[in-house]
Amino acid sequence: MSLIMLQSCSSSKLSVFSKSYSAEDLKIEKLDFDYLTIKSKIQFKETHKTTKATALIRMKKDSIIWFNLSGALGVQGVRAIITKDSVKIINRVEKKYYLYDFDEVSKEFKFPIDFNLIQSMIVGDMPKPLDNSNSIKKSGEQYIIKQNIENIRITNLVNLQTMKLVEVNVTEKETDNSLKLLYKDFKDVNGQGLPFSIFISLIHYNEFGELETQLTINHSRAEASDKPLRFPFSIPKKYEAQ
């Protein structure tokens, strides 16, 4: 009798975890905004080096990400504007500027990076949209969404109660380089949940082994609005291109 009950429970448990869901079954909460202003504390950590700064971030959804850094030696006076096709950075202390397309950014970080990925990292949305080609299953208190898109594999973890994204793991197939995103401390912004604590880990490999870059972002204030924001950015003629 005990054996039969055990087998019955195991069979029942297996069916719960093996059930698949469609994209229409999930109503994952996405941050809806026209313009967004965020003030954050950031910490950037590489091998043997940690940099801290305060960031003022302004965004126009799906179009512009602008930020200004202050408070730390080496990043004081750094301003950047990110659009769909480029990243522009000026350092007003060193009087230098940098212009990149996303192929160059991806090469620098040894991982495929685009505008949508950066935007999703800041607001806690899925980097790639959900569709019926994705594998969707439920495990414990989370939905597990697996995506296989061109040269990357993505695993998204969504909280069952809040329907908010809490973790993303992205792996580049060819190199095995990986990106991990963790979202915590969700707070209300215009009736929607925004993660105020974000941890980003980027791992790549070279001839010496594994190298990790970490970025921690802690928002202190966030405001969504339908009123246009300013994104001041200009490069003085006397600045040197790098």
Q: What feature does the model see in each segment?
A:
Residues 12-86:
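Start-of-domain marker
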